[in-house]
A protein has these predicted regions:
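Bacterial N-terminal signal peptides
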Residues: 13-24
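N-terminal secretory signal peptides that target proteins for export/translocation
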Residues: 1-9
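Short stretches within intrinsically disordered, low-complexity N-terminal or propeptide regions
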Residues: 8, 15, 27-29
Length: 342
């Protein structure tokens, strides 16, 4: 005899929750593209070109949808946006919305962005003539479904500060913090050194105060995951590129800074992009785990960071699981795929 016994409501809720998580994982594995806004400094390190190349490759595979690209910092040649547009155009995506930070700091001269601007097809204006990153952010976010957008920050947090403290405008009646709270699913940040240290993206050129303000005021409903200096610094990718990488924008960028084409380059930004799109693992291969429970404390003067165990602000940082050489091979395999033939 079969007896029907009603399950308690809390058990039903738990089972439904597990089913939804499982269905979400299956959907992501079979083509539900992650909606991404990438916020890059694109200044002196060709690794930003690597990261954008990787994101376009993941988009070609159906794993990501690039909603917009914005540049932060002040590249003195005013060619950061053009370099971004070169890569997107190379991959057949010339119409991705593109904006630039208008704040005038921190300043640096790039040895490769003007080369990309002058030698490869694109349609972007110099940074001064591009739309503001703030306008691009608000316009793109306003059009997206709630809790659907992953922001990838691989530079300074200056644009995010502008968005966070922005007022309602033509795009949305929501203030910036409320627009983020409603539309953003997750923020992935290349920044900091964990459990403590000083790192470039949080500290260079007087951005410590900005870093402090963003992380203090970010809505706790939207998780932040940090990919620290120690994560990318141990993964040297691209040692085979001198022999295997075809001529094009990425090869040119790597040739003109840090001898990166010959020796490879640390993979800070690329790994942040990889996490933003694939999460902690892919097809049964675990890349990282999360250190959770607590938050980052920032010194506003120096930009130095310390992980505190309390209060819990829905922040976490990546902890390496897959050995660096294997992560490098994951990146290289994707980068060397090149643009999908249209």
């Amino acid at each position: 005899m079969i007896m029907n016994k009603a399950l308690p409501l809390h058990r039903i809720a738990m089972i439904l929750g597990l089913l939804l998580i499982g269905l979400s994982a299956v959907a992501n594995s079979y083509g539900q593209a992650v909606k991404v806004i990438v916020d890059t400094d694109m200044l002196t390190d060709p690794e930003d070109v690597n990261a954008l190349w990787l994101l376009n490759t993941l988009a070609d595979r159906g794993e990501a949808e690039i909603l917009a690209c914005v540049v932060n910092g002040h590249e003195t040649n005013r060619a950061s946006g053009a370099a971004v547009d070169v890569v997107n155009t190379w991959f057949g995506r010339p119409n991705i919305p593109l904006g630039a930070f208008k704040g005038g700091y921190p300043k640096k001269r790039s040895p490769f962005t003007p080369l990309l601007r002058d030698r490869f097809p694109h349609s972007a204006s110099d940074d001064d003539k591009l739309p503001s990153a703030l306008d691009i952010y608000r316009g793109v976010l306003a059009k997206q479904p709630d809790k659907s957008v992953v922001i990838v920050s691989i530079g300074f947090l200056v644009n995010l500060k502008d968005v966070l403290f922005s007022a309602p405008d033509k795009h949305s009646s929501l203030a910036g913090v409320d627009l983020i709270r409603r539309k953003v699913k997750k923020l992935a940040v290349m920044g900091g050194k964990y459990p403590q240290g000083v790192e470039y993206n949080f500290s260079f050129g007087g951005v410590g105060k900005c870093t402090y303000e963003v992380l203090q005021q970010w809505p706790a409903e939207v998780p932040i995951v940090f990919s620290g200096y120690e994560i990318g610094g141990r993964v040297i990718s691209g040692k085979s590129y001198k022999q295997k990488l075809p001529q094009g924008p990425l090869r040119m960028a790597l040739e003109h800074q840090y001898n990166a084409l010959a020796r490879g380059r640390e993979s800070w930004d690329e790994l942040t992009v990889l996490y933003a799109v694939r999460g902690l693992s892919c097809q049964g291969v675990e890349y990282w785990k999360l250190h959770c429970g607590g938050c980052v404390s920032i010194d506003a003067k120096t930009g130095s960071d310390v992980w505190q165990n309390a209060p819990n602000k829905n922040q976490s940082y990546l902890v390496e699981l897959l050995p660096p050489d294997r992560l490098a091979k994951v990146l290289e395999g994707l980068i060397l795929t090149g643009p999908k033939k249209k």
